[in-house]
A protein has these predicted regions:
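Non-transmembrane "mature" sequence context
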Residues: 1-97
């Protein structure tokens, strides 16, 4: 993922992301929660789709099972992340609708 994508999903600026990364600073609770949600969803996608690059490609494309929405864009809220994770679990069980 690009720094721009990560920063947008975490709700922080790219410069803030780079500073936090360089100084290994502790993130505030809300940003930490968003980072956990992002990491968890990416891990599930990689597990289900069995390929890191394929998982990132899937997360960046409109998905019919999400009403044509882009999974990464849904990860800004917990409700959106839940929708993405539910679809990934459905795919894992062979139910892609």
């Amino acid at each position: 993922m690009t720094d721009a994508e990560i920063a947008r999903l975490l709700g922080i600026g790219e410069a803030t992301l780079r500073r936090a990364r360089a100084s290994q600073a502790t993130l505030d609770a809300a940003t930490s929660d968003r980072l956990y949600r992002l990491s968890k969803t990416i891990a599930i996608a990689e597990e289900v789709l069995e390929n890191g690059e394929g998982a990132m490609s899937w997360l960046r494309r409109e998905q019919p099972g999400l009403g044509g929405q882009v999974p990464l864009k849904l990860l800004v809220t917990q409700a959106g992340a839940d929708q993405v994770e539910t679809l990934l679990r459905r795919i894992d069980y062979g139910v892609y609708t």
